Amino acid sequence: MSNIDVAAIVFTDDTGRVLCVRKRTSPRFQLPGGKPEGDETKVHTAIRETREEIGIDVDAEQLSYLGTFTAKASNEPGHTVTSTVFLHVGVPTDPAPDAEIAEAAWIDPADHTGVEL
């Protein structure tokens, strides 16, 4: 099984909801983030992808390492995805999804009924 490396950022609001995005090519919501370009660091990958996907500029000092997680890739059969995830300090304002993102939503991780993750 081939592996895909990605980096992502967790944004939470004051009620504990998590900001997630849904790409136009997928029914599932996920954290904003994506694949590295060249020899880009994980932090810089997460920052660039977040800016590209939802228009939020993040400073590296606002991030702390949350962990690295591996799971089956949801939209690439025969692959696993290893996500290096960072936690953002503070609540971002006005995410603006770009062309590849169908929607951005604040999702309660304890009650995500009707939302495919």
Pin down the residues of each PLM region.
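Conserved N-terminal beta-strand and adjoining loop/helix that marks the start
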Residues: 1-18, 35
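Active-site-adjacent beta-strand/loop module that shapes the phosphate/pyrophosphate-binding cleft
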Residues: 4, 69-95, 105
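Structural detector for helix-capping/boundary residues
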Residues: 7, 34, 48, 89, ...
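Conserved hydrophobic "DFG−1" position in protein kinase catalytic cores
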Residues: 11-12, 20, 87-88, 106
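Acidic surface patches and DE-rich sequence motifs
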Residues: 13, 23, 73-75
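Nudix hydrolase/Nudix homology domain
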Residues: 24-29, 94-117
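Conserved beta-strand segments that form the floor/walls of ligand-binding pockets within enzyme
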Residues: 30, 64, 85-87, 116
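The catalytic Nudix box helix
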Residues: 31-66
